[in-house]
Amino acid sequence: MAKAAKAAGSSARFRQRKISVKQTLAVLKQSDIPDLEEEQQRELQQIETGVEKGEEEEHHLQAAINSSIAQSTGAKVEKIYIPTPDASQVWKEYDRFYSSSFHEPASYIRTSVTVEETSGCLYNMDDEDAEFLKTCKPPISEDDFEEVMHRFEVTISEKQPFVSIDVSNLLSFEEMAQHIEDGIRQVQEDPTSPEYILAQLQSSLGITVNGTKGKNEGKAFLATFKKIGAVIYPHWRARKVERKGQSIVPHLKFEDHEKDDSDPYVCFRRRELRQVRKTRRTDVLSIERLRRMQAEMETAKQLVEMVATREFTRKAALKAEWDVFEDRCAIKTLKRELGIKGEDEDLVAQKKRKVEPKKEEKAEKASTPVRGGKAAGSAASAQAAAAQAAAAGSGSPSVSSTHVPPNVSIPPSKIPNMDLITIAQVVRDKDEAIAKAVREKLRLRADADRDWHNLTNSGYIPYCEYLNAEVSSSGEPPVPQYSSINEMAYFEKHNASHRYTTKSDFNKDLASMVGNKPFADAQVYGAIVGDDGELRLSDATSTSSPVDRVIPRSSFMSMRKRVGRGGRMWMDRRGLQRNTVLKPSSLAKNSLDDTAESEADEVAMERLADRQKYDRETEPTRQMSSYDKDPSQLNGISSDTQSIRFGSMLLSKAYENYREVFQQRQQQLMMLQQQILQQQQQQQMRNRQQSHPPGDPGAGLGGGQGAGGGAGGSRNNSPAPGTNGPQSKMHNAAPMGYNKQGMTPSQHQQYQQMQQQQQQQQQQQQQRKMGVAPMNAASAAAAMAAQPRRSSGSPDGQRFNGLPNGGAMANGVLPNGMSQRMMPGGDMKQKSELAKVDA
């Protein structure tokens, strides 16, 4: 019944293991199996003993299980207990069998699982060693014997690790003893060694070891080794030879793949892995790999053979050339000795002739299909033709025989040998191509602009530190940094007022239009611009640009949100400053000297400024200097990144031709200035001749003329005697042309002086390194004396309002804006001199 329960329980709980040929199987008959009823079998399967399977057969346990089953069915059975030893009493004979002699150890128990050397001597005696110690004289203790044997084993493993190859070459005792003694002394002198630290602790703490207090173990063992080392060495050598050089200390035996694994002493056997099933597919893949490898090896072999054949052929060719050279030298010497004269062409090394391809190869090359159809073929032919043309133009030898168009499928054996090109050469060729393109672009630009004169109002003149060196000292560029993109890109509202200064602007029909719509390139000096785009002059000597806003240099708007007291949210804007354009002082210059009226204007302007303080979404409007008109500054681009913004201008703004173009422009402007002065003088001379007869004493320079006339005239705004406003306007509309007839000798003399001064200025302009020389005070005074003045409000002033700086040119002197624009060498000192002469 117990066996049946065991079989039933094992079959229910454990998986049947795989049948092996090495496992014995029990053969059971029907009579061996107990015939149990189905109900009893079902009950037995549900009983759990709670012990291991090997202990379920214990008869006390089986008796207890059967009695509990009988009690559950209602039968009366004696209660059975499993006997256990009685632990309630004390064993009286305990002291006789277990002695209580215990000696406290010298130190704590030390052990190391990973480092075995720290656990003490690793050598353990066996029966042979015990027999040797019995017969050994003088007697040796077991601990000393094991320590010496261990030292021998460690020393031989360090000095002769391959002693198993030849056991007869073991070290002698003298060599081993010398090495062991040196090692002991080195350990004793090393403060970091465990033996040294242990000895110091024992001596300092007073710990006794084997009855000796603080004794150094190293020194004790060294003395012991000198006594018994020579006695133990023959025994150790005999055992080493018996082991064939292997270690005397027994080691675990591991599995050896070369031998049979049926050895029962092998430990740590490998886990048996499931053998991989071989199928036809794996065999095919292996065969394919082998075939591919064989083909690659054969190809490599053929390549090596071909390279070797090529090198041998080259060697033979070099040897043949050398033989030919020696024969030529011998023939030359022989001809000199015999005095033979004749042609020596065969004795000179001629250039090798290029081997022409055969007709068959040419036909095959011509019939080779081209990828991509006709378009690819035409592109390939075009590239080939371009490459040939470039080679011919640069003087390099033609490569047409070895050049192959791209996208052409040819066999690998017929790929031409092309020279390798370095990266430096590619970069150099690219730079040369770019420089050549720049030069060609500049040449075409110069040819296209040869018959044109650039007289535009808003021509952009980039700032150059080399050509405008005086900017660093004065702080103001002599040429306004202005570009037409200010109106075109940012100020589309004022495109209608943008005009160009050409000869067509000087006729009578456009005079009214020019007077009503001022130009956009006039220099701004403290002008106020209204929201309607109209100009409000703050100074009688300056005009204003139609610019009514300034593009911010930084971001469009910078805002910050913060939490104030009481949880209120505040929004702060960056750059909330007072509007400097709406200052009352800017309008006080044009107003009368009435104190009450000026104070009222100031109060009104303050109220207006306070009302419009937060109405602007950008930075407060401020005065634009010549640097602010530069596009890079308008766009808010820093000086470090301007090269990115203006990188596209490199082809047309080359520095090597900029200086020449700049000087040509200044010369053209000077010529235009001279022509305008001549036209003004001629027109004024005609006006005086028509208004005063030849005998009239008012024809002199001191006669009364227009407002702001000559040196002897008054500077009022009323017409001079002998002239009137409409008449002078009609005179200004007369045809222009220079004519010496009708001029008085004094006027002609003054005109010649003015021409001489202009010639001197041109000479100074050529001598200057960086631009045109400015006009001095003498030339400005001569220009003032040579022509009368007219007020900016007169018709003549409106007539020449198209010139730079408004109609100040009609006054007979170079206006401030013109002197600064046309003469880069001018500065603020020159402006002050002109102002003094004008006064």
UniProtKB/Swiss-Prot annotation:
Keywords: Cell cycle, DNA damage, DNA repair, Nucleus, Transcription, Transcription regulation. GO terms for biological process: DNA repair; regulation of transcription by RNA polymerase II. Its main location: nucleus. InterPro entries: Enhancer_polycomb (IPR024943), Enhancer_polycomb-like_N (IPR019542). GO terms for cellular component: NuA4 histone acetyltransferase complex; nucleus; piccolo histone acetyltransferase complex. Residues 621-640, 714-730 have a biased composition (Polar residues). Residues 697-713 have a biased composition (Gly residues). PANTHER family: ENHANCER OF POLYCOMB. This is Enhancer of polycomb-like protein 1. It comes from Yarrowia lipolytica (strain CLIB 122 / E 150). The gene is EPL1.
